[in-house]
C-alpha cells in the first residue's frame, strides 16, 4: 500500500478538526487551549509538507520551519502568561486572564 496525497491531507484534516473540537469543548483551561492551537499548527504543517513532497517543491518544507519558529515563540509566551496567572490567582482558568494588570 502506498501513501498518497489524499492520505496525508485526510490526516491533516482530522488533526485540524480534532484541534477545533478541543478549542470549542474546553474554553476554560489554558493548557488545553495551547495544546489545541499547537495541534492545529501541526495539521497545517502536515499539509504543507505533503503538498511540498508531492509537487516536488521545497518551499512548503521551508515554510514549515518558519511556522515551527512562530509556534515555539507562541508556546513560550503562552506558558509565561500561564505561570504568571498561576502565581497570582492559583488557577489556570481563562476567565481570570482579564484580572492580570501589568
UniProtKB/Swiss-Prot annotation:
Q: What enzyme category does the UniProt record give?
A: translocase
Which molecular function term from Gene Ontology is one that the record holds?
quinone binding
Which GO terms of the cellular component aspect does the record hold?
NADH dehydrogenase complex; plasma membrane
Would you kindly state one Gene Ontology biological process term found in this protein's UniProt entry? ATP synthesis coupled electron transport
Membrane-spanning intervals of the chain: 5-25, 31-51, 62-82
Its annotated compartments are: Cell inner membrane
Q: Which Pfam families match?
A: Oxidored_q2
Bilayer disposition of the protein = Multi-pass membrane protein
Recorded catalytic reaction(s): these are: a quinone + NADH + 5 H(+)(in) = a quinol + NAD(+) + 4 H(+)(out)
EC numbers on record = 7.1.1.-
Q: Which UniProt keywords apply?
A: Cell inner membrane, Cell membrane, Membrane, NAD, Quinone, Translocase, Transmembrane, Transmembrane helix, Transport, Ubiquinone
> Where is it mainly found?
membrane
Highest taxon listed in the record's lineage:
Bacteria
Looking up NCBIfam families in the UniProt record yields: PRK05715.1-2, PRK05715.1-3, PRK05715.1-5
Main role? NDH-1 shuttles electrons from NADH, via FMN and iron-sulfur (Fe-S) centers, to quinones in the respiratory chain. The immediate electron acceptor for the enzyme in this species is believed to be ubiquinone. Couples the redox reaction to proton translocation (for every two electrons transferred, four hydrogen ions are translocated across the cytoplasmic membrane), and thus conserves the redox energy in a proton gradient.
Q: Which protein family is it in?
A: Belongs to the complex I subunit 4L family.
The annotated subunit structure for this chain is: NDH-1 is composed of 14 different subunits. Subunits NuoA, H, J, K, L, M, N constitute the membrane sector of the complex.
Q: Which protein are we looking at?
A: NADH-quinone oxidoreductase subunit K
| Organism lineage | Bacteria, Pseudomonadati, Pseudomonadota, Betaproteobacteria, Burkholderiales
Q: Which gene encodes it?
A: nuoK
Amino acid at each position: 500500500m502506498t501513501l498518497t496525497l489524499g492520505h496525508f491531507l485526510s490526516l491533516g484534516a482530522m488533526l485540524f478538526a480534532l484541534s477545533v473540537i478541543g478549542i470549542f469543548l474546553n474554553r476554560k483551561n489554558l493548557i488545553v487551549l495551547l495544546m489545541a492551537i499547537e495541534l492545529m499548527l501541526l495539521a497545517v504543517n502536515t499539509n504543507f509538507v505533503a503538498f511540498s513532497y508531492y509537487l516536488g517543491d521545497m518551499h512548503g518544507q521551508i515554510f514549515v520551519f518558519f511556522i515551527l519558529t512562530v509556534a515555539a515563540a507562541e508556546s513560550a509566551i503562552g506558558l509565561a502568561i500561564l505561570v504568571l496567572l498561576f502565581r497570582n490567582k492559583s488557577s489556570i482558568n481563562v476567565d481570570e486572564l482579564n484580572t492580570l494588570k501589568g
